[in-house]
Amino acid sequence: MAATGGGAEDESRSGRSSSEGECAVAPEPLAEAGGLFSFADLGAALGSGAGLPGRAVGRAQSPLRYLQVLWQQDVEPRDELRCKIPAGRLRRAARPHRRLGPTGKEVHALKRLRDSANANDIETVQQLLEDGADPCAADDKGRTALHFASCNGNDQIVQLLLDHGADPNQQDGLGNTPLHLAACTNHVPVITTLLRGGARVDALDRAGRTPLHLAKSKLNILQEGHSQCLEAVRLEVKQIIHMLREYLERLGRHEQRERLDDLCTRLQMTSTKEQVDEVTDLLASFTSLSLQMQSMEKR
């Protein structure tokens, strides 16, 4: 009877029922300053199976019970222990598990990002990036949103992707970087943006070509073509000159850059197709010489 009475008295004193289970038990206050929790004491208690030190006789709690209460999340009174894990720490801890594989929603968002970049839809691209879409995610051919934007010549989307961590040197399945695609299509503003964003000017595609090789190929096409009008040819030659100027500026070849400036001035003074062709020939020779110099420097 005494034991029964003592148990009832303990229940009334603690304000709980024994049927509630230990999950609802709040930790009892420490008896004195010397009873503060320490991992050394906890380790000793776990090894011996004894209660935690620093408590009055008859009130020792098991280590497992103490740990259960330590991480209890529904503690409300101010004098009870509060050991909730910060939300930021939980997100960081869950990140590796989330990276194990994208969800269907994430896969759809990444496809929308590439499709929007290909469609020049800058508003959707910006919204998806702000929602956390990975700008480096590629399709089954290795193409990223930056590849599509660079090929289309959309400088604004290119800059937006770079600002959100897109890799300017990421290669697609054929070995092309965004800079290769921009050089092939002569999108000068995109080339400038990619160079400033850290694109490597010496990056090779699978065929071993640099953006300089692609520029020369474009010049060869212009030299062989006869159907384009004067203004169209002049515009393309001007774009190639601007692209090569950025290329040489990145390499620090200031003397060669001055020669390009002279060619650009001469191009602006042309008034006939023959004069434009002459500048094109000079530019092609200049490009070939630059390639030879680059090859000699690598030896």
Curated annotation (Swiss-Prot):
<dbReference type="Pfam" id="PF00023">
    <property type="entry name" value="Ank"/>
</dbReference>
<keyword id="KW-0677">Repeat</keyword>
<feature type="modified residue" description="N-acetylalanine">
    <location>
        <position position="2"/>
    </location>
</feature>
<feature type="region of interest" description="LYN-binding">
    <location>
        <begin position="140"/>
        <end position="240"/>
    </location>
</feature>
<feature type="short sequence motif" description="Nuclear localization signal (NLS)">
    <location>
        <begin position="98"/>
        <end position="116"/>
    </location>
</feature>
<keyword id="KW-0539">Nucleus</keyword>
<feature type="repeat" description="ANK 4">
    <location>
        <begin position="207"/>
        <end position="239"/>
    </location>
</feature>
<comment type="function">
    <text>Plays an important role in regulating intracellular signaling events associated with erythroid terminal differentiation.</text>
</comment>
<dbReference type="GO" id="GO:0019887">
    <property type="term" value="F:protein kinase regulator activity"/>
</dbReference>
<keyword id="KW-0963">Cytoplasm</keyword>
<protein>
    <recommendedName>
        <fullName>Ankyrin repeat domain-containing protein 54</fullName>
    </recommendedName>
</protein>
<keyword id="KW-0007">Acetylation</keyword>
<comment type="subunit">
    <text>Interacts (via ankyrin repeat region) with LYN (via SH3-domain) in an activation-independent status of LYN. Forms a multiprotein complex with LYN and HCLS1. Interacts with TSN2, VAV1, DBNL and LASP1.</text>
</comment>
<feature type="short sequence motif" description="Nuclear export signal (NES)">
    <location>
        <begin position="282"/>
        <end position="292"/>
    </location>
</feature>
<dbReference type="GO" id="GO:1902531">
    <property type="term" value="P:regulation of intracellular signal transduction"/>
</dbReference>
<dbReference type="InterPro" id="IPR002110">
    <property type="entry name" value="Ankyrin_rpt"/>
</dbReference>
<dbReference type="GO" id="GO:0045648">
    <property type="term" value="P:positive regulation of erythrocyte differentiation"/>
</dbReference>
<feature type="repeat" description="ANK 2">
    <location>
        <begin position="141"/>
        <end position="170"/>
    </location>
</feature>
<feature type="repeat" description="ANK 1">
    <location>
        <begin position="108"/>
        <end position="137"/>
    </location>
</feature>
<dbReference type="GO" id="GO:0044877">
    <property type="term" value="F:protein-containing complex binding"/>
</dbReference>
<feature type="repeat" description="ANK 3">
    <location>
        <begin position="174"/>
        <end position="203"/>
    </location>
</feature>
<dbReference type="GO" id="GO:0006913">
    <property type="term" value="P:nucleocytoplasmic transport"/>
</dbReference>
<dbReference type="GO" id="GO:0005634">
    <property type="term" value="C:nucleus"/>
</dbReference>
<dbReference type="GO" id="GO:0030496">
    <property type="term" value="C:midbody"/>
</dbReference>
<dbReference type="Pfam" id="PF12796">
    <property type="entry name" value="Ank_2"/>
</dbReference>
<keyword id="KW-0040">ANK repeat</keyword>
<dbReference type="InterPro" id="IPR036770">
    <property type="entry name" value="Ankyrin_rpt-contain_sf"/>
</dbReference>
<keyword id="KW-0597">Phosphoprotein</keyword>
<dbReference type="GO" id="GO:0005737">
    <property type="term" value="C:cytoplasm"/>
</dbReference>
<feature type="region of interest" description="Disordered">
    <location>
        <begin position="1"/>
        <end position="27"/>
    </location>
</feature>
<feature type="modified residue" description="Phosphoserine">
    <location>
        <position position="62"/>
    </location>
</feature>
